[in-house]
Amino acid sequence: MTEIGLSVDLATISKLLESAKSTLQEKQASDDDKHGQQKLLTKIPKIISSSFELPSYFEKKFVMGLKKDELVENSESYINDASFEPTVPIYESHVSAPGISKKKKNIKDTAGSNWFDMPATELTESVKRDIQLLKMRNALDPKRHYRRENTKSMPKYFQVGSIVEGPQDFYSSRIPTRERKETIVDELLHDSERRSYFKKKYLELQKSKMSGRKGQYKKLQQRRKPSYLK
């Protein structure tokens, strides 16, 4: 009997110890959670204190609200009704709403008021060739020297005109009517003196480019050969 009583006492004591241990663990975990929450609360700053005054636009009179008359009763009946049409007009994506003016279309592409609103000229092939010739005018006449042209791009705003000679100008400074053409390129091509000068310059450039190449070396070999091998 004594052994049975001792075993029962030991079992009850062990149960009590386990229950006490579990309660201590639960209490410790709850204390840790509270301590962590307090730490987080201390880190977060207070944005609005009791002494802080809200600005005027947060007051109730500026906040928009809904009136009871504006609320729709039985909204489900409107949703289920097939004949219901919205009062707000729906515009298509490619159609602009009325009252919106497209200002970009009315703006003209000009050089500005300082240049008397000079419009942008259309760049045709003949106009491009004339502009390229004007940029290379240093090569047209060996007796005239011009400032170097640095811009490679075509101008956007420009005008083309013809100089009208006065009666006091000497006849040598005028271009005869037979030699007048529509473009600058045509006038240069119809001038025989210019054409001979351009041909001479072209041959000089070709000679300098071909120097030291295969063709020149072959010609040199032919000249070095003796007369009986030629």
UniProtKB/Swiss-Prot annotation:
The keyword rRNA processing applies. One of its GO terms (cellular component) is nucleus. Residues 209-230 are annotated as: Disordered. The keyword Ribonucleoprotein does not apply. It is found in: Nucleus, Nucleolus. Keywords: Nucleus, Ribosome biogenesis, rRNA processing. Residues 210-230 have a biased composition (Basic residues). Coiled coil: none annotated. One of its GO terms (biological process) is rRNA processing. It comes from the Eukaryota. Belongs to the FCF2 family. Involved in pre-rRNA processing and 40S ribosomal subunit assembly. Required for the early cleavage steps of 35S rRNA at the A(0), A(1), and A(2) sites. This is rRNA-processing protein fcf2. It comes from Schizosaccharomyces pombe (strain 972 / ATCC 24843).
